[in-house]
Amino acid sequence: FASSTQSLQLQRGVGTSTNGAGAFGASLNMLTDAFSEEAYAKISSSVGSFNTLRSNVKFSTGLMNDHFEFSGRLSRVTSDGYVDRASSELDGYFLQGTYKDDNTLIKALLFGGHEITYQAWNGITADQLENDRTYNSAGEYTDDNGDTQYYENEVDNYKQDHFQLHWYETWNSAWNTHLAVHYTRGRGFFEQYREEDDFATYGLEPFTVNGELVETTDLIRRRWLDNDFYGTVFSATYNSENLELIMGGGYNEYKGDHFGEIIWAEYARNSEIRDRYYDDNSTKTDVNFYTKANYQLTDQWSLFGDVQYRGVGYQANGEDTGLVGDTFNFFNPKAGVTFDLNRNNNFYFSYARANREPNRNDYENGSPKPEKLNDFELGWRYVSPSFQLNTNVYYMRYKDQLVLTGGLNDVGAPLRSNVGDSYRLGLEIDANVTLSNSFKWRPNIALSDNRNLDYFFERDGELQDLGNTNIAFSPKLIAGNIITYQPNNNFQVSLLSKFVGKQYMGNIDSEGSVLDSYTQTDFNIQYTINMNSFIKSIELSGLVNNIFDADIVSNGYFYTFDDDYSNPGTITTIEGAGYYPQAGINFLVGATINF
C-alpha cells in the first residue's frame, strides 16, 4: 500500500483529532497519491534471499479533459521466509478515480489484498536459539508410524477489500469541507492440525470402540473471522489571517463474526464437515466530534486547542469474551503554545488528555478497564541551511494502562492487562546534518524510563509488592543513524544502523524475560539511468540487511504459571519464554522501469 501513497506522517504522542479517533503512542496519517497531470506507467521487480520475489505494476491515465484521472497498482510478494516453512504469498491492488475542477476534488478508492502465510508464531526456546534458530513447531505432528510430519496447510488465509469516497470542496477563501464514506470487507481463517484434542472442546460425544472409550481425536480446524467495517468522517475548515478552525467528527461501526469449523477429524461420529463448534458475534460503534483551533497571537506566539468527544459501544456474546455490553464516553482535551524565538529557533509546550477503550483481545483476558493518559510535552526545534535539530521531552502519566503482559493467546496475539498507575518519561532527539554537498547525516536517539508503580505479583502463592517495575517491551535506549552519499541526482548510497537496548518481555523484572540489546546495520544503493525514448528511466536498487550478520532477537514472549500438582500442598511459580530470531545477512536487488 505504501507504493500508492504520496506521504506518510507520523505524529508522536497523543494524536490530533483531525487524524481520527486518537492514539496514545503515535498516529500515522497516510495520504494516497495525488492525481497526475501526465500519463505514466512503471514496472518494478525485486528478487532476494529466501526465494523472495516482489513485483509491482503501477499506472495513471494522466488528467483527461482537464478533470478526470484514473490510476492503479497491482502487486505480488512471495517468499519462503527465514524460519522453516514460514512462507508468504501476498497479493494487493489499488484503483483510484479522481475528478477535479477549480474548487472540487472527488476521489474514489478501491484497494485490498489477500495473504496466505504459514504460521510461525510459536517461537523457539533459549536452547533452540543457540542450536536451531529457524525451527518452527507449527504444523508438526506424529503419524501412525511414529514419524514427525508437518501439515502443509497450517496457514493464515485472509482477504480484505476497502472502498472509500472522498469529497473536498473549497467554498470561498475562508471555508473548505471534507466528507468521506468508507466500507471495509474482511474474511479469512487460520487452519491448524491438532493432535488428540478433547471431544468436549468441539461439542462432540465420546464413543466406545472394542470396549475402549474414545474421547480425543486428531483433527483439522479453521478459525474464521468474517467482518464488516463502515462509516463516515467529515470536517469543515475556516481560515482567516490569524485563525484556523477545524470542526468535524465521524461515525464508524464494526461487525465481526468469529467462528470455528472442523474440516476433518479422525474420529467424529456426530459431526459433519464444516460444523461450527463456536460462533461469536461482536459489534463496536464509535462516534466522535471535535473542534480544533490554531491562533496566531503575535508574530512569535501561537496557541492551539483541541477538544474531542468520543462515544464507544461494545456488544459481544462469545465464549472467549463472555457477554459484553459496555459503553464508554470520553472527553479528550488538548492545548499547546508555540514560541518562535527567531527564524532559527522554535519552542513548544503541549498538554493532552486521552482515553482509550480496551480491544476484543483484552476482553478475552478478563474484565478490562479503559486507559486514561495525561501527556505533557516540551520541545525545541532548530533550523538552519545545513543543520536541523528536533528535541522533545515527554511525561506520560497513565491510570489503568493496558500494558503487554508478555504472554500470547491461542492464536499468537499478545495479551494485555490493566496496571494501576504507570508512567513513561523520555527524551527524543533527531537531526539532519549536511556535512557537504554530497554527504548527509541523520542521527536520532530516544532515552526513556517506563515504569509500573507499586506493581504486585503473586509468586509461589504469595502476593508480593515488587515496587516500581519496568514496563514490558520498553527499552530505555533506542538510537539510529543514516549516512547518505549522493554525488548527483542519479546515484545514492546509504548506510543505516539501529541500536535497541535491553528490554523485558514481562512486567516483573525477571532475568528470564530479558531481550538482549542488539545493533543492526543495513546498506542501500540506488542508481537511475535516464533515457530519451519510450522508456523514461530505469531505477536500479540494492539492499543488504544486517550486513554484519548479527544474531538478532527483536521479539518474543514471556509467561508464568503456578504449579500446584508436582508437589501437592505447595505452589511453585514457573517461568517460561519464547523467542523470535531475525535473519542474518540477507539481500534484495530490484529494478523499476518508468514509461
In which residue ranges do the predicted regions lie?
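Transmembrane beta-barrel wall of Gram-negative outer-membrane proteins
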Residues: 40, 47-78, 83-120, 166-172
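Gram-negative outer-membrane beta-barrel transporters
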Residues: 299, 395, 417-507, 594
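Short acidic/polar hinge/loop motifs at secondary-structure boundaries
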Residues: 1-12, 31, 367
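C-terminal beta-barrel architecture of Gram-negative outer-membrane proteins
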Residues: 79-80, 473-532, 548, 556-557
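Acidic/polar loop-and-plug regions of large Gram-negative outer-membrane beta-barrel proteins
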Residues: 98, 105-164, 191-219
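Membrane-embedded beta-barrel scaffold of Gram-negative outer-membrane proteins
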Residues: 170, 174-182, 340, 346-352, ...
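C-terminal beta-signal and adjacent terminal beta-strands/loops
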Residues: 399, 441, 449-451, 499-504, ...
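Structural signature of Gram-negative outer-membrane beta-barrels, strongest in the C-terminal barrel
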Residues: 102, 252, 277-398, 434-436, ...
